[in-house]
Amino acid sequence: LSLTSLTWIPSAAGPVEGFPGTWRAVDGERVYATFSSDDDVTQNGAPVEGEVVFQLDDGGSETSLRHGTKAAEVAKRGGRYAVRVRDSLAPTRQRFKGVPVYGYDPSAVVKGTFEPFDKPRDIPITTANPAVPGVAHIVGVVEFVYAGASAKLVVQGDSSTLTAVFYDGTNGVETADWRYVSFDAPEGGRAGSVEIDFNRAANFPAAFTPFGTCPMPPVGNGVQTPIRAGERRPSADQPV
């Protein structure tokens, strides 16, 4: 809700939208940000003047820079550096009215089976930002029946908790374009029965901001029937 901009950092020094300083990325390895005393920027609460260097692993973020109500999130995604500006006074945050949800539906709690892979697999996925490739670390498959229709979803997670990132028939109208649901794994992450409560299906941050880089479902990871349970699409004045 607080995100207000996303700027990919160029190799030639230049500005980023919504935050002071000049910024440049070198060979996808480091970011150099330069500030003057007039920029009124702090790092970890201390005034900054001169050059600040960031070096992150892919997928990492750093949010030590502040300017008034704004924070600069330096992030590395898909081998590229970006700055996302977060503002505690962002309009989306100011007018937030809460996440709409469906009423509790006991029929949305379904039994299923989990079958782990021999070894976890990393598969390429798309994300909420077309410029940012993603990877899903999938550990197995869950099978279940929802409203009379059989479904199979690949899941991520560990020996205690599994997560399915999924599509269903409500997406883009009643719900966000995709959602996720987490549930307990069988003991030790072994093959066995699971209970999936779709009343706990939730939106990713990308449902509330165009500046998200949230993971999308693996190809084909969907349920054909509408799942009218869990979190709904944010209201019209909370853009999806």
Labelled PLM ranges:
Residues 18-25, 70-76, 151-155:
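Broad, structure-driven detector of short, well-ordered beta-strand segments within folded domains
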Residues 143-189:
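Acidic/His-leaning functional-site neighborhoods
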Residues 68-136:
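Surface-exposed beta-loop interaction hotspot
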Residues 38-88:
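Protease-labile, long low-complexity intrinsically disordered regions enriched in Pro/Ser/Thr
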Residues 17-19, 44, 66-68, 145-149, ...:
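Short strand-coil-strand connectors
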Residues 193-195, 199-240:
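Extended, aromatic/histidine-rich regions of cofactor-dependent oxidoreductases associated
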Residues 8-11, 17-18, 110, 128-134, ...:
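C-terminal, non-catalytic interaction/recognition modules in large multi-subunit enzymes and RNPs
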Residues 2-3, 8-58, 189:
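Forkhead-associated
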